[in-house]
């Protein structure tokens, strides 16, 4: 399924089905947290958190596609991300967009 951040799909006519969302929430690994604490002192990328964020983003997109597919969509346009923290040790990522059906 095509997922795009653009409003239009070049050369394609479609009708709008509606909004779709894909959400995931991840918790930090307490052992990786120890390494992250040290990195925050000396500086540098915290690879464990970067990987967690990438995996969360990918899962949110897959869930977005699954929801769109259930609605009979052929694509999702205007896809966006939002993220936030829940408490001190959880990260939530949502992918959202507009499900469309080709005509």
UniProtKB/Swiss-Prot annotation:
InterPro entries: UPF0145_dom_sf, UPF0145_YbjQ-like. It comes from Enterococcus faecalis (strain ATCC 700802 / V583). Belongs to the UPF0145 family. This is UPF0145 protein EF_0241. It comes from the Bacteria. Gene3D superfamilies: Hypothetical protein apc22750. Chain B. It holds the Pfam family YbjQ_1.
């Amino acid at each position: 399924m095509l997922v795009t951040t653009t409003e239009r799909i070049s050369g394609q006519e479609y009708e709008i089905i509606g909004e779709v969302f894909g959400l995931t929430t991840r918790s930090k690994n307490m052992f990786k947290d120890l390494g992250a604490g040290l990195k925050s002192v000396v500086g540098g990328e915290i690879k464990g958190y970067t990987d967690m964020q990438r995996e969360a983003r990918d899962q949110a997109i897959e869930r977005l596609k699954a929801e769109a597919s259930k609605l009979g969509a052929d694509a999702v346009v205007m896809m966006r991300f939002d993220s936030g923290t829940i408490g001190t040790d959880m990260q939530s990522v949502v992918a959202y967009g507009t499900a469309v059906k080709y005509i």
